[in-house]
Amino acid sequence: MDFEFSPRQKELVAKLSGFFEDHIYPAVPVYEQQQAEGERWKTLQIVEDLKKKAKAAGLWNLFMPPSAGHPQVDDSFEFESPRLTNLEYAPLAEIMGRVSWSSEVFNCSAPDTGNMEVFQRYGTLAQKEKWLRPLMNGEIRSAFLMTEPAVASSDATNIETRIARDGDHYVINGRKWWSSGVGDPHCKVAIVMGKTDFAAQTHAQQSQVVVPMNAPGVNIVRMLPVFGFDDAPHGHAEVVLENVRVPVEEALLLGEGRGFEIAQGRLGPGRIHHCMRIVGAAEVALEKMCQRLMTRKAFGKYVSEQSVWEERIARARIDIEMTRLLNFKAADMMDKAGNKVARLEIAMIKVQAPNMALKIIDDAIQAHGGGGVTSDFGLAKSYAGIRTLRLADGPDEVHARTVARMELSKYGDLQQKIRAEQAERVR
């Protein structure tokens, strides 16, 4: 891969960095003030104002790669996007990761990005006009309902939500949780994964359907806190689906029994987008740590001069650089060979990025002493948010298993040779 940014990439990085300096960073205290006033689950005016500015600046729908322009169902839908490659998008997502809520300003936040790609690749023209267009215009938001509290959802074949055919409708029954974004008053639609045929082959039982959030039987049971943070105004919910009826023609994505296929196509880009933003969050934590250490004295000298902190700072810089390069490699592989071929790189970065950032944020918390565990410096909330990414879109253990099995597959001949020798000795 070429480490030199393309002219377009350089231009967008400069433009986005300038937008952050001029608009995002000054808006942080305004965002916090508006968030603290009154109802928690509400639209924040500062975000809506910034969306208009971002759209006018051409910093809109940056996430949608050219590969998303090869839909399996409909290829007539037109949308506004610069159509960046994953590699071109990577440094932009990293910048967005510096302020946790900023990706929404550019219409690049999860779970909407993944849902928009699903609609583009697998939706009918009618589904796109009804849901994708307002999503890409930033008029509504969405949710993805997959994880369930009653089963180990890291194995998607365990999903128990039932999607039963009843004439021209589906009737949906199930319980989901960690349904991100449901608390947002703009959340109008969800993509739900469940089973349409429990007797089919294991990976052909699941389907994905589109469900309006105002459909009768969609019940938000509770909002789930993350280490005490409610993540308002978007949040994560437990949702019960009780006899929810949706028309088959309007709801079904791609076809019955193809939900697992859609999920695999959706989660690859989503995973790497998270990892790109994580690098930005880690950079902020390192900056805060260095600034704190350079201004505090203990035992007669600045804390930054203590050898233990020099080691931690050096390790943080090395780990950030390594993770950034692995991000770029995964993005480049996705662009050149496709998500399936880039499976190893995606799995590696999904394990590496959150663990890297959590270590740096934890060191930054330590550098701030008691203040680090308060909300005064933003480190505790950053830690809480990134800790969820060791679970979201597949836990570390699942991705590590993928890496290990692909590594061990290189030694299949050796294993066969050993078994043959053992069999020979037995004879």
Region locations from a protein language model:
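Short, surface-exposed charged micro-motifs
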Residues: 160-162
